[in-house]
């Protein structure tokens, strides 16, 4: 079904090739909500009657199935409205372009996903805090250059993960704030002669503000790319953790045991415990980076203003988002069930402690360092400092000393609570604004 005017004729294969129907299935509800806001704004601005607004809103509510044969969701919805309401349904095209409409719907969908992901990261961080509380004295190795470094604890490792997640959480929250601005009312590129209140439309849709310049509003995808970029940073970090756990659970190192639900055996070798979930996560991180790369490559050569290339970016937003959603769940499950096996730390991992103790007695550190190093090379080094003693000797904030770790846990718990509260208040503000849209809609149709 071709609703909008075209030049010349169009072959079926061309319609199929340029159609965005498949990727538009992701934003059906958002497109409907944006259309409602537009119809309500036309009514509030005096361009359509209450009866026309009511009939159009009821038609929007009756649109459920996105059928093949249309160029996109916008064409399908408008055709449904006109067929349901009659000629009066054609008012939905007044003061509106698919360009500002889709840009708004994409932001609504990304906003929804980002809020979900932010809550999921909070949940994961809480898991790490609870695991840390019972792991302050469980010895755990550290590595630099993947060579044994110094003794640490499992709690120290868990809090390292939480620390990185805190940073990434704030990156993603900043993306949420950028995404939550409204393009609606910007028309195709230079606005419209129809006197619409863009700020009122933005309020009804729960946005914080409008994107002022109409060229930017209709054709920029930088805020969405920024969101995918920050989600990719989360996957980048998850991939490092996956690599840690794959190596540490291998029979060569054998320091951690992964939950049985996240390993698989071999069809031939019955002794195998393959870290299959983490291997898939590691590869899915690459898929997310591929989505980001695709966004860059599609976007980089476009002249300013809307181009249909932009619709080919949409599937990459949602692919990365869904990878992130499932990966958070996987990491959470693995970290909840991970076990540290009995293992022996090499005495030489406390060599730094020995050198520092010598320096504390008044020997210049480099001289103390060389004294210890020479004994190690000569094979005569014996440390009287146990790994457990080593961790208790650590004197700086952020180190694995259990006493300092417990203080860090309290600080992190407070920070998580503050960030969760901030997110909840922000979400409630959005919901409160959108409730006004629902109130007006109900007043019109009931």
UniProtKB/Swiss-Prot annotation:
Location in or out of the cell: Cytoplasm
A Pfam cross-reference name: Lyase_1
Keywords: Amino-acid biosynthesis, Arginine biosynthesis, Cytoplasm, Lyase
A GO term, aspect molecular function: argininosuccinate lyase activity
EC numbers, comma separated: 4.3.2.1
Main location: cytoplasm
Keyword Transport in annotation: no
Chemical reaction(s) catalysed: 2-(N(omega)-L-arginino)succinate = fumarate + L-arginine
PANTHER family documented for this protein: ARGININOSUCCINATE LYASE
Family indicated by similarity: Belongs to the lyase 1 family. Argininosuccinate lyase subfamily.
Protein name per Swiss-Prot or TrEMBL: Argininosuccinate lyase
Species per Swiss-Prot/TrEMBL record: Sulfurisphaera tokodaii (strain DSM 16993 / JCM 10545 / NBRC 100140 / 7)
UniProt gene name: argH
């Amino acid at each position: 079904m071709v609703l909008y005017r075209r030049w010349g004729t169009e072959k079926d294969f061309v319609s199929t090739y340029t159609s965005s129907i498949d990727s538009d299935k992701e934003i059906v509800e958002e497109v409907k909500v944006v259309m409602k806001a537009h119809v309500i704004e036309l009514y509030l601005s005096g361009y359509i009657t209450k009866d026309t607004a009511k009939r159009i809103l009821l038609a929007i509510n009756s649109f459920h199935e996105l059928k093949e044969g249309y160029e996109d969701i916008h064409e399908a919805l408008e055709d449904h409205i006109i067929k349901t309401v009659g000629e009066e349904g054609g008012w939905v095209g007044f003061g509106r372009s698919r360009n500002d409409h889709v840009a708004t719907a994409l932001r609504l969908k990304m906003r929804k996903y980002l809020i979900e992901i932010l809550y999921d990261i909070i949940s994961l961080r809480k898991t790490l805090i609870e695991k840390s509380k019972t792991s302050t004295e469980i010895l755990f190795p550290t590595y630099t250059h993947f060579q044994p470094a110094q003794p640490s604890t499992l709690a120290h490792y868990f809090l390292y993960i939480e620390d990185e997640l805190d940073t990434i959480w704030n990156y993603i929250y900043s993306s949420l704030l950028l995404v939550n601005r409204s393009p609606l009312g910007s028309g195709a590129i230079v606005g419209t002669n129809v006197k619409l209140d863009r700020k009122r439309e933005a309020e009804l849709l729960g946005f914080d503000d409008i994107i002022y310049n109409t060229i930017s509003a209709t054709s920029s995808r930088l805020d969405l790319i920024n969101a995918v970029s920050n989600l990719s940073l989360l996957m980048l970090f998850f991939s490092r953790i996956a690599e840690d756990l794959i190596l540490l659970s291998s029979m060569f190192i054998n320091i951690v045991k992964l939950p049985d639900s996240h390993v698989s055996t071999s069809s031939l070798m019955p002794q195998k415990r393959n870290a299959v979930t983490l291997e898939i996560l590691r590869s899915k991180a690459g898929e997310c980076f591929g989505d980001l790369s695709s966004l860059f490559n599609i976007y980089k050569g476009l002249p300013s203003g809307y181009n249909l290339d932009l619709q080919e970016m949409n599937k990459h937003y949602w692919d990365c988002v869904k990878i992130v959603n499932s990966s958070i769940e996987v990491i959470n499950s693995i970290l909840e069930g991970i076990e540290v096996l009995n293992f022996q730390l090499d005495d030489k991992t406390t060599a730094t402690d020995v050198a520092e103790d010598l320096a504390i007695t008044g020997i210049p550190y480099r001289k103390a360092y060389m004294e210890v190093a020479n004994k190690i090379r000569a094979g005569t080094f014996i440390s009287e400092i146990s790994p457990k003693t080593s961790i208790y000797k650590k004197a700086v904030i952020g180190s694995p000393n259990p006493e300092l770790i417990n203080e860090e846990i309290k600080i992190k718990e407070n920070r998580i609570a503050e960030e969760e509260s901030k997110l909840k208040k922000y979400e409630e503000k959005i919901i409160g604004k959108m409730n006004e849209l629902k109130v007006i809609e109900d007043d019109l149709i009931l």
